Each structure stands twice: as C-alpha cells, then as structure tokens.
Amino acid sequence: MNNEKESALTAMNTNGRSKLTALLYKTLMSFVGVLVLSMGESFMLAANMGMDPFTSANLGGSSLLHMGLGNFQLMVNFVIFIFVLFSDRHMIGIGTVINMVLVGYEIQWFSAIRQSLFGTANSLTLQIINAVIGLIIFTYGASMYMTANVGVAPYDGVAPIISRWTHLRYRVVRVIQDIIVMGLAYLVGGPFGILTFIVAFCTGPLIEFWTDKVNQKIYNLI
C-alpha cells in the first residue's frame, strides 16, 4: 500500500516538473518570437514604406509627444491590457507581458543596430530589400510567439473579445479594428504605406506557413 502511495506521489511530482519545464520552454519560445518579430519591425521601419497599424499609430503618437517608442507603446499596451484583463483574463499570460513590455524597446534597439550596420535605405531597391526581409522576419516571429500559446498581445486580445460581445465573426471585427487603427496612424503622422496594408491584411498565409512548417514542430517537441 505504501509503495503504491509513493509511486503515485512520484508520478505527480514528475508530472508537475514536466509541466513546469514545458511552460519554461514555451515562455522562452514566446520571448524569442517577440525578439524576432521586433527585429523584423526594425527592417520594415528602415524601408520607410509603412508599418503594421498598431506600431505605426504608436510611432506617430510617440513622435507627437516627443517620447521614445518603447515608453509610449508600453503605456498604450497597459491601457489595453487593463481592458483585456477585466473582459477576459483567460487571454492573459506570460506571453502577454513579454509582448507588451518588450516590443517597443526592442524595435528601438534593433533599429539602432541595423542603422549602424547597414545605414539608411536611400534607394527604392534598398527599401524593397528591407521591406521583404522585414516581412519574412516579422511573420516568422509572429508565428513563433503565437504558437507558444502563453498569452496574446493586448492589441490582439481586443478583436476576440469584441467578436464575442457583438456575435460578429472574428475576421470581420479584426479588419474593422485594423482599419480604425490605420486611420488613427495616418492622423497622427505614423509611418503609413503599402506595408501597413500588407501586414494588416495579407500576412496571414505567410504566418500560417511558418506555423505549419516550423513552429508547430518546435511546439510539439516542447
């Protein structure tokens, strides 16, 4: 009888350690994904052909208030985070915190590194090269961070909540959300261009490609 209890306790402890190890690996996966995503954003910023709607709006707002992107985006994320927390706290996880705190600062950091290594993209060819590299890296990082499944960015949590409240399809709500934020980005003078539309409406298939071919396999190993 005692041996059975000891075996059960051992199994429970082993299972607990396994879950903790898996969580740590998934957190690391989310962290690396956000790091890669931010690197991609820095190349898109250098291309000067627009940014994703949320970052574009934050860049415009931070410029108007003479603040760094990291500080401004953190404040905006915190406001959205409070909304998501009280609306559906199940969407919050360690990945939420990683994304909301780090992305703005990492874009600043990678932009400085990219500038020192490669200089300014002062021709259309260099702009296109930076845009393509940025999109590839950005979508891979976005796929990795989302596949880790340890919480969504505050901005990404808004559409599912509104969709549930209004009974509208998620895709419809997300498109409306991105269009509103694109309009805001334009009004505040954020980087606005072809990349803004591409990131908002056309990167889904590339993110799915990275998820199916690479990141889901990494997640399954975890």
Protein language model annotation of sequence segments:
Residues 2-222:
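Core subunits and conserved enzymes of cellular information-processing
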